[in-house]
From Swiss-Prot:
Assembles around the rod to form the L-ring and probably protects the motor/basal body from shearing forces during rotation. GO terms for cellular component: bacterial-type flagellum basal body, distal rod, L ring; cell outer membrane. GO terms for biological process: bacterial-type flagellum-dependent cell motility. This is Flagellar L-ring protein. InterPro entries: Flag_Lring. The basal body constitutes a major portion of the flagellar organelle and consists of four rings (L,P,S, and M) mounted on a central rod. A lipid is attached at C22 (N-palmitoyl cysteine). One of its GO terms (molecular function) is cytoskeletal motor activity. Coiled coil: none annotated. Residues 1-21 form the signal peptide. It comes from Escherichia fergusonii (strain ATCC 35469 / DSM 13698 / CCUG 18766 / IAM 14443 / JCM 21226 / LMG 7866 / NBRC 102419 / NCTC 12128 / CDC 0568-73). It is found in: Cell outer membrane; Bacterial flagellum basal body. Keywords: Bacterial flagellum, Cell outer membrane, Lipoprotein, Membrane, Palmitate, Signal. The gene is flgH.
């Protein structure tokens, strides 16, 4: 008796886990890894007895006299101006039609067809038609605006800067996350240390949230399971 109950319990547990696995869709973040970077300390300079030092380590407090202070090293920051506006539309239509008509008659009905047509002249008409009309359309638009300050986490060999950043905003019982990563050309950085997101290569922009409001927008696992099985 107890053995059968335990067996039934195990089967029910496996069924529930299998339903959850079939209906659950994993969420993979666009921006993976750390969203900040710390400056890398340089080696201690070696005094060679000369006034001019041909090679000096990275000096984060160095300020060029005839050049704007722009990010150039790991740990430097710059501001990304989010100006994303994407729209797309698509439409298609198809028409097809086909008509057919056939007419034939018998002056003398064959003997084996007299039971069907009689002895008089018989005329047979046949006609058919087929028609199909189909239309489809899709429209999509996306607008994202704002600012986000990011950190340089990698300096590429060609001088471009790979940047990452994250902003968290807590509102009531929910938290909004804005994450960004991409490759910035230092020539596109303005004097105010900003660069538009439209000039960032390999941009990854992610805007997600958690809390009860976000959970209310998600479909339950059981409902998602039946939605996956439904043929409609």
């Amino acid at each position: 008796m107890h053995k059968n109950a335990a067996h039934t319990y195990v089967i029910a547990s496996l069924l529930v886990f299998s339903l959850t696995g079939c209906a659950w869709i994993p969420s993979t973040p666009l921006v993976q890894g750390a969203t900040t970077a710390q400056p890398v300390p340089g080696p201690t300079p070696v005094a060679n007895g000369s006034i001019f030092q041909s090679a000096q380590p990275i000096n984060y407090g160095y300020q060029p006299l005839f050049e704007d202070r722009r990010p150039r090293n790991i740990g430097d920051t710059l501001t990304i101006v989010l100006q994303e506006n994407v729209s797309a539309s698509k439409s298609s239509s198809a028409n097809a039609s086909r008509d057919g008509k056939t007419n034939f008659g018998f002056d003398t009905v064959p003997r084996y067809l007299q039971g069907l047509f009689g002895n008089a002249r018989a005329d047979v008409d046949a006609s058919g038609g087929n028609s199909f009309n189909g239309k489809g359309g899709a429209n999509a638009s996306n607008t994202f605006s704002g600012t986000l300050t990011v950190t340089v986490d990698q300096v590429l060999v060609n001088g471009n800067l790979h940047v990452v950043g994250e902003k968290q905003i807590a509102i009531n019982q929910g938290t909004e996350f804005i994450r960004f990563s991409g490759v910035v050309n230092p020539r596109t950085i303005s004097g105010s240390n900003t660069v538009p997101s439209t000039q960032v290569a390999d941009a990854r922009i992610e805007y997600v949230g958690n809390g009860y409001i976000n959970e209310a927008q998600n479909m339950g696992w059981l409902q998602r399971f039946f939605l996956n099985l439904s043929p409609m």
